[in-house]
Amino acid sequence: MTVGGAPATKVSRLVSADESVAVSGPPPRFVGRGGEKLAAALERFGVVLTGKRVLDAGASTGGFTDCALQAGAASVVAVDVGRGQLDWSLRNDERVTTLEGVNARDLDPAMLPYAADLAVVDVSFISLTKLIGPIAACVAPEATILAMVKPQFELGKGRVKGGVVRDASERREAVSGVVAAAAEHDLAVRAATEAGVPGPKGNREVFVRLERGAATAAAERDALIEAAVA
């Protein structure tokens, strides 16, 4: 981005009425940067969304919702504890049902128009271990859950300096904790991968693919997690 013909490198840059503002490069594919993260995970996991009914827990501006629709999803229920954040284009899309002011930990199947074929999860300031149960109750028996693990919100208070988890062993602990919580709800990890785009502060987030069925062998489970956090 340039302002008055010069690169604008700080968000605090003030702009006068007579200065020109220009943005170079291609426009973003999605309404939020999370869309790029989900798109990369869908490709790596080989997940096809064509015709699927999706639950987006922690929708925010709608990056995941936008990505899901562009990937062929039939419909999306966008859930977020906040209000007024979802991009206007999605808010007015007939394929999107918006549930604002709803904490994902309070989700109940009766709130949704359907049992989702797939759930995508991107939440902050709360551990995924508190959300797995309610989300699992809102999806179909054969559904897939793609949850993005943010290590900085999975580790205990006081363990994350500067808001960034840099140690691979701590990232492993965070992902393992989510996988263990999922197992309590008969969900097994089938795949794991580092998110393609780092978090705003540089945190390396990890997507886990969870599905019901036979438990993944411990050695395979640990290998999946290790590869994703290495």
Q: Which residues are covered by each model-predicted region?
A:
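A short glycine-rich, Lys/Arg-flanked "PGG" loop and its adjoining helix->strand segment in the class I
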Residues: 129-146
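Conserved S-adenosyl-L-methionine
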Residues: 67-75
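Conserved class I S-adenosyl-L-methionine
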Residues: 49-60
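Flexible, glycine-/basic-rich loop-and-beta segments that form/coincide
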Residues: 204, 209-230
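Short, glycine-/aromatic-enriched active-site segment of Class I SAM-dependent methyltransferases
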Residues: 151-167
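Glycine-rich SAM-binding Motif I of class I
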Residues: 62-63, 84
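S4-like RNA-binding module at protein N-termini
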Residues: 1-48
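S-adenosyl-L-methionine
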Residues: 74-130
